[in-house]
Amino acid sequence: MSQQNGNVNRVGAQDRVGASGGMEHSFGFKAVDENEKQGLVNDVFHKVAKRYDIMNDLMSAGMHRVWKDAMVAWLAPSKRPGWTSLDVAGGTGDIAFRIVEVSGRQAHVTILDINGSMLGVGRERAIKKGLIDNLEFVEANAEELPFEDNSFDAYTIAFGIRNVPHIDKALSEAYRVLKPGGRFLCLEFSEVELPVLDKVYDEWSFRAIPRIGKMITGDADSYSYLVESIRKFPKQQDFAAMIEKAGFERVSYRNFTGGIAALHSGWKL
């Protein structure tokens, strides 16, 4: 049950979705029909696509850039020709660009996103960076990937899986399209585990982020949804259990900045 803390709607751990799932019925704190959720999420990202980096800066106080660097460092992309990665919900290219550059421009990355506006931003950025030859852009649903079994050496998703209505389906699809020996990595906002930081981050999230979002983009509602969706997402241990249930082995996670974000890893063995 949500607790009132001044004007801050603070969500306790009991309000988070557990390992059994349930994100398909929530749009932030609002209960919705699961058939509505994807359309509502799409509307949010159509609105914020051109300001996506600003959005992530607001959500993470600029730390998302450090976390993404750490994600790709832990992935350790191969520098051998032919190594392939699928970056899901990766429209603007932040993770894919890092993978290509760390691999010495040997990796080929498929960027998949359900939102065409996000992909458009990513394609423009890729051309400006001179990375377009290493990339493919695909508009499709994470729950129904348009690829053959055992297609990719790695699967990454950053700040995207909490927006997928059926997380279990997305995880099953990730497992299916990875080659044996392939690696799954997911970076997502998570449960802050330091009590003082928890309170500070709640104040920042619920008071400041929507207001700043409105000043910069004229849209407070999208930022409110994004904050609320973080508080509904499963905590670290529960999400790890979901990854294991999808078939992955050697599942582990690392907290960043006291648990503001967590990086989960699993292997298809």
UniProtKB/Swiss-Prot annotation:
Named in its record, the pathway it takes part in is: Quinol/quinone metabolism; menaquinone biosynthesis; menaquinol from 1,4-dihydroxy-2-naphthoate: step 2/2; Cofactor biosynthesis; ubiquinone biosynthesis
The keyword Coiled coil is annotated on this UniProt entry: no
Q: Which reaction does it catalyse?
A: a 2-demethylmenaquinol + S-adenosyl-L-methionine = a menaquinol + S-adenosyl-L-homocysteine + H(+); a 2-methoxy-6-(all-trans-polyprenyl)benzene-1,4-diol + S-adenosyl-L-methionine = a 5-methoxy-2-methyl-3-(all-trans-polyprenyl)benzene-1,4-diol + S-adenosyl-L-homocysteine + H(+)
Q: Which SUPFAM superfamilies match?
A: S-adenosyl-L-methionine-dependent methyltransferases (SSF53335)
Superkingdom of this protein's organism = Bacteria
Entry-linked CDD domains: AdoMet_MTases
InterPro entries per UniProt: SAM-dependent_MTases_sf (IPR029063), UbiE/COQ5_MeTrFase (IPR004033), UbiE/COQ5_MeTrFase_CS (IPR023576)
UniProt enzyme class: transferase
Keywords from the UniProt entry: Menaquinone biosynthesis, Methyltransferase, S-adenosyl-L-methionine, Transferase, Ubiquinone biosynthesis
The EC designation for this entry is 2.1.1.163, 2.1.1.201
So what does this one do?
Answer: Methyltransferase required for the conversion of demethylmenaquinol (DMKH2) to menaquinol (MKH2) and the conversion of 2-polyprenyl-6-methoxy-1,4-benzoquinol (DDMQH2) to 2-polyprenyl-3-methyl-6-methoxy-1,4-benzoquinol (DMQH2).
Stated family: Belongs to the class I-like SAM-binding methyltransferase superfamily. MenG/UbiE family.
Stated name of the protein: Ubiquinone/menaquinone biosynthesis C-methyltransferase UbiE
- This protein's species is Brucella canis (strain ATCC 23365 / NCTC 10854 / RM-666)
